[in-house]
Each structure stands twice: as structure tokens, then as C-alpha cells.
Design a protein with these regions (language model features):
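Conserved active-site segments centered on acidic
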Residues: 2-73
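Short, hydrophobic beta-strand segments that form beta-sheet elements in well-ordered domains
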Residues: 80-87
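Phosphate-binding/catalytic loops
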Residues: 93-166
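Short glycine-rich anion-binding loops that position phosphate/pyrophosphate groups of nucleotides
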Residues: 16, 87-90
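Glycine-rich nucleotide phosphate-binding loop and flanking beta-alpha elements
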Residues: 62, 89-93
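Alpha-helix C-terminal capping/helix-to-coil transition sites in glycosyltransferase folds
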Residues: 76-78
Length: 166
């Protein structure tokens, strides 16, 4: 991998909450080392207002994100890393992506599925944010440029399985 920022794609079905949060966190915390994107297999067409609220509340930029189909990326950019953040997207047949991206599944419960009070919805989005941030922080600590693709995939998968057990 080169000195250029790594292109990272976060995928989920609706591209309205979890994948948007992942894109926003990595865009902010990656400090120019990564170019983050998000997409969905069946996008809702709008970013969930609770995702926007969560980002703003935690001091992250919340503007400029959109719910879009993964087909928008069929012709590039070439992704270095691809993360599925919902179980349904992980189970779907994903497109063949240009290049040789390393992929991993980081399953996060869907905060948009939570019904209840505003406090319960806010808590669900905060939990999803924290889970994604923890995984992204662990990824940012990896010596990505020096890892072979298979070793990198194993480490990224392990982050998805172990991050919230600590």
C-alpha cells in the first residue's frame, strides 16, 4: 500500500445509519490517512436524522453525507478496505470491486430499528457510534502499510469480533 490515503468503503443495507457513522468517524479520525465512503445495497435515500444528531452531539461533521447505492462505486475508486457493518449486507452477494480490496465484517446492531422514546433511540445511536469508533480506533493503530493482505484481513476480522468484549 502506498503513501496515498487508503480508500475505505462502509457497507450496509440502507446506508442511512451505521455505514454513515463509519464514514464520518473515519473521515474525521483518520487524519487524512484514509478517504472514507459509504453505500448500501438497498439505500433508503436519506440519512437517518438520529445519525446526524449523534454526529453533531459528539462534535463530528454531520454535513455532506448521503444515502446511496453501492452501484455508484462500480467504476471506482479502487477500494483498499471494505467493511460490512450489518449482517444482511454481509450475507448478500456484493459487487466485484475494482482492485483487490481487503474486506471484513464488523456487525453492529441496527440503531434505526430501535422503537421507543427519543432517549432510547439516542442511546441506540450512541451505542452504534461507540462500537464503530472502537473498531476504527483499533484499525487506526494497526501498521496497515506493513501487513500482508491475508494478515490484514485476519486482524480486521478480529477487531469486528473482539472490540466490544473489552
Amino acid at each position: 500500500m502506498s503513501d496515498q490515503p487508503l480508500n475505505v468503503l462502509f457497507l450496509c443495507t440502507g446506508n442511512s445509519a451505521r455505514s454513515i457513522l463509519g464514514e464520518a468517524i473515519l473521515s474525521h479520525d483518520g487524519e487524512g490517512r484514509f478517504k472514507a465512503y459509504s453505500a448500501g445495497s438497498n439505500p433508503t435515500g436519506k440519512v437517518n436524522p438520529w445519525a446526524v444528531h449523534t454526529l453533531k452531539t459528539l462534535g463530528y461533521p454531520a454535513e455532506g453525507y448521503a444515502s446511496k447505492s453501492w452501484s455508484e462505486f462500480a467504476d471506482g475508486p479502487e477500494f483498499d478496505l471494505i467493511f460490512t457493518v450489518c449482517d444482511s449486507a454481509a450475507a448478500e452477494t456484493c459487487p466485484v470491486w475494482p482492485g483487490r480490496p481487503t474486506s471484513a465484517h464488523w456487525g453492529i446492531p441496527d440503531p434505526a430499528a430501535v422503537e421507543g422514546s427519543d432517549a432510547e433511540k439516542a442511546a441506540a445511536f450512541l451505542d452504534a457510534f461507540r462500537m464503530l469508533k472502537r473498531r476504527i480506533d483499533l484499525m487506526l493503530a494497526l501498521p496497515i502499510a506493513s501487513l500482508e493482505q491475508i494478515a490484514l484481513r485476519e486482524k480486521l476480522q478480529a477487531i469486528g469480533h473482539e472490540a466490544d468484549k473489552q
